[in-house]
Amino acid sequence: MKLTQGAFSFLPDLTDAQVTKQIQYALNKSWAISIEYTDDPHPRNSYWEMWGLPLFDVKDPAAILFEINMARKAKPNYYLKIACFDNTRGIESCVLSFIVQRPSYEPGFKMTRQEVKGRQLVYTLESYSVDAKPEGERY
C-alpha cells in the first residue's frame, strides 16, 4: 500500500529532475527547506526526524539534492520528505511537503474497531510495520 502524505502523493514517485524543479520553486518563493525522515508512516505522525539542520541559506537546488542523496544513502529503508517553510508574517508554517523516498515494501495499515460507551464506534489506524518491529528496524 503506497503511503499518501503531502503533495504529489497520488502521483508516481518524483524523479530527481522533478524534485529539483520543486526545490527551485520553493527557493523562488524564499521558503526554507528541510529534509525529514521516519520509519513510522502513521498519517498523524507529523513529527518526523530532521536530517541535519534546515537549509535556510542554501539557494542552489543541486546542493539540496546532494543532501537528499546523502540522506537516501544513510537511510535507505526510511521515508524521506522535503518540507518547505514560509516565514512570512501571518503564514509562518509549512506550505509544501512531499515524499522523495519510500521503502521498497510498504505493508500498509490495519483498522481496529472498538465499541465504547453508548454503542459508539471508535476507529484506530495502526501500521503493520510498527507492530512487527521496533523503531529503526521496521523496513
From Swiss-Prot:
Q: Please, which domain of life does this record's source organism belong to? A: Eukaryota
Cellular component terms per the entry's GO annotation: chloroplast
Query: What SMART domains does the database record attribute to this sequence?
Result: RuBisCO_small
Location relative to the cell: Plastid, Chloroplast
Molecular function per GO: ribulose-bisphosphate carboxylase activity
Tell me where it mainly resides. plastid
One GO BP annotation is: reductive pentose-phosphate cycle
Alphabetically list the UniProt keywords.
Calvin cycle, Carbon dioxide fixation, Chloroplast, Photorespiration, Photosynthesis, Plastid
Q: Describe the function of this protein.
A: RuBisCO catalyzes two reactions: the carboxylation of D-ribulose 1,5-bisphosphate, the primary event in carbon dioxide fixation, as well as the oxidative fragmentation of the pentose substrate in the photorespiration process. Both reactions occur simultaneously and in competition at the same active site. Although the small subunit is not catalytic it is essential for maximal activity.
Describe the protein's quaternary organization and the partners it interacts with: Heterohexadecamer of 8 large and 8 small subunits.
Family that this chain belongs to: Belongs to the RuBisCO small chain family.
Q: Which HAMAP family match?
A: RuBisCO_S_bact
Another remark in the UniProt entry says: In this alga, in contrast to plants, the small subunit is encoded in the chloroplast. The basic functional RuBisCO is composed of a large chain homodimer in a 'head-to-tail' conformation. In form I RuBisCO this homodimer is arranged in a barrel-like tetramer with the small subunits forming a tetrameric 'cap' on each end of the 'barrel'.
Q: What is this protein called?
A: Ribulose bisphosphate carboxylase small subunit
Upper lineage: Eukaryota, Haptista, Haptophyta, Prymnesiophyceae, Isochrysidales
